[in-house]
Amino acid sequence: MNIYIQTNSKQFLASKVSAYSFIRFGHNVKLMNFEESEILKKYLGKKYLRSGKLKTYENDLQSFTPLRFLAPILNNNKDLILVIDPDIFAISDPKIILDNVNDDYDLYCTSYNKILRSEMMLINAKKIQWNFEKIIKELFEFKIDYKDLMSLSFDPSLKIKIIDNKFNSHDKITDDTVLLHTTNRITQPWKESLIIDFDKGNSTIFNYFKNITKKTLGMKFDRNIIQSKYQKHPDHKVLNAIKTIFLEAKRNNFITEQEIQFAIKNKFISEKIFN
């Protein structure tokens, strides 16, 4: 099974460690790098719709996300492929995901709060005929909303099967977890203590001061909104699992000392992940 991982310079080292977590189980992995996509780069600074609101496309922590729709073409529109974000790691052999496959479906993914999640997709590439350049063009022509793109509702022809969340486990590890997704960006273990470098979305000035007030009054508040630095992951099992994979990748020379020091120097990762 071929694995396609989306990435960019900010998440490149993490994506290599993610790749290692799959390769150790004998799978083929290919990285899809934003910096290598001329189609995406030409839209930097352009406007697009996200939940009906205008946003500016920037090369930030998640500039790679549209690349997930390129993977079937890269695989010559054949075979089953697994497409994932760079912050997803194989805790156990993901080959069991193939037990869900039958010819009735084009795509398999998880659902949270009744919303389909495209950060992990098992795609029957021979059934998918996405025109990547057309999709991106329509995104920046406001014909497709980013929210609809990510939730897969932009393509009503898709036959989608919802599979168990153990294949996209959000920030927790259980005995059943196959793929761990460190989806809460503020607690990604390789970023701990670094200055936050992503758009918090709902972090308006009003929300910021509202949560500061709540904290002062001893009320329940949203820590993510008022933090200026990446925080330690609250789940020790997740933290230890990610550290172990990073250390294994380093020990087996899958990531080099030069790559590590470059990432630390540019504040793409925190040296704490190796301590």
Which residue ranges define each predicted feature?
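Conserved hydrophobic/aromatic beta-strand scaffold that supports enzyme active sites
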Residues: 71, 107, 118-122, 160-162, ...
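Short, acidic, metal-binding catalytic loop of nucleotide-sugar glycosyltransferases
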Residues: 21-28
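Extreme N-terminal starter segment of soluble prokaryotic enzymes
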Residues: 1-3
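Active-site-proximal specificity loops/subdomain of glycosyltransferases
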Residues: 30-74
